[in-house]
Amino acid sequence: MTSVQLETPHSGKYEQPTGLFINNEFVKGQEGKTFDVINPSDESVITQVHEATEKDVDIAVAAARKAFEGSWRQETPENRGKLLNNLANLFEKNIDLLAAVESLDNGKAISMAKGDISMCVGCLRYYGGWADKITGKVIDTTPDTFNYVKKEPIGVCGQIIPWNFPLLMWAWKIGPAIACGNTVVLKTAEQTPLGGLVAASLVKEAGFPPGVINVISGFGKVAGAALSSHMDVDKVAFTGSTVVGRTILKAAASSNLKKVTLELGGKSPNIVFEDADIDNAISWVNFGIFFNHGQCCCAGSRVYVQESIYDKFVQKFKERAQKNVVGDPFAADTFQGPQVSKVQFDRIMEYIQAGKDAGATVETGGKRKGDKGYFIEPTIFSNVTEDMKIVKEEIFGPVCSIAKFKTKEDAIKLGNASTYGLAAAVHTKNLNTAIEVSNALKAGTVWVNTYNTLHHQMPFGGYKESGIGRELGEDALANYTQTKTVSIRLGDALFG
């Protein structure tokens, strides 16, 4: 069986694929293995899905290779764009279902999940528009040569996506890869496979030929490792932790030196100057850390506030965080649902305990909410020092630290005091301060008087240990193309 009927409070009953999507069909795994998908809201088993093993990865890669070397390689850019737009239209048509499935196995609030799907639609349409605009150039060197440079697809792309934004990452990865003419084998996160499989069911309906987009469910140490080290995969793209990113980079290097892009962890500073609109800043700082349950690689988990407004800010921020509704992801007023899994829940609670043990002050939160499901109260630590684990390490949950700074130079130094460099934010009414601090911060994205406002037209990625390459925007096309130089001799003689 490769599908099962499920039901959500938002979408009603629907058919949930559970197989591996290879060659436009849902199939069972070669070894017949399945694994449980857990509902993080109540800790129950939602269903089982088929687990991809190394044998299944081989089959999926072979399907992608056959498609790439066959008719897909000759497909016109215009038609690739049409197919991506068809897929975007189907996402839009099925927005309620896709959002509900996200909330079911990820636990995110349904209002946030709908926002994710809208962003998927925008992303797929954006890259659909790019498909026929990827151009080369002619370079003049000497009168007797004609030289041109063209962009070609890389080939078979392995893509490994995380559990925090399952469908959004699905679109971020597939959009540019397909626009550039590649084929794809995408592995969903084992915690959240359901949305990616429902999305895969739309691929055939959109008109894609068999083998162009393949979606498999499985574990990182098995299917992810097989993709990363596969000798017939030309490119691997990964979003997730820095620890796993290093493993993937090593696997790529020790196999066929496949190209790699990595979007990894973060410990992003959110800096509030004394001249900022304090109420506006508090709203964005709250959103910056507690959005998506704090499960964002770019979460603003290190808050730095200028000392003259520090006490006032802490009090107001605490009051704002306490208003965040934590609970059933399908309730209309819920802002924060459960953490994605017991493993993640336990990890976050360990960090909270470490903060307490180190002497930090819990301004609010610091506890589990309820006794069922992986819910954690929004947590703010004050009286922190830069050497504390909760300040240095990525927690990936609804936990932030808040500290004082005196001068602009102090803020910059504190902001850059991390091995990560994914994102940062500056809150100020002074344009000179905004520009100077933004330029000085070692981060791939800096927001000013806002936070988490990503857009598919804007490149996103990190400095330092936060990754290699950029997602989104025109920059992402470079992840999925290679450059070919052609030089044609026009004269007859070898020299002269």
From Swiss-Prot:
Enzyme class: oxidoreductase
Active site residues according to the UniProt entry: 263, 296
Protein name per UniProt: Aldehyde dehydrogenase
Record-linked InterPro entries: Ald_DH/histidinol_DH, Ald_DH_C, Ald_DH_CS_CYS, Ald_DH_CS_GLU, Ald_DH_N, Aldehyde_DH_dom
Subcellular location: Cytoplasm
Record organism: Davidiella tassiana (Mycosphaerella tassiana)
Gene3D superfamilies recorded: Aldehyde Dehydrogenase, Chain A, domain 1 (3.40.605.10), Aldehyde Dehydrogenase, Chain A, domain 2 (3.40.309.10)
Pfam families: Aldedh
GO molecular function, one term: aldehyde dehydrogenase (NAD+) activity
Recorded family membership: Belongs to the aldehyde dehydrogenase family.
Gene Ontology CC terms, in alphabetical order: cytoplasm
CDD domains according to UniProt: ALDH_F1-2_Ald2-like
Keyword Cytoplasm tagged: yes
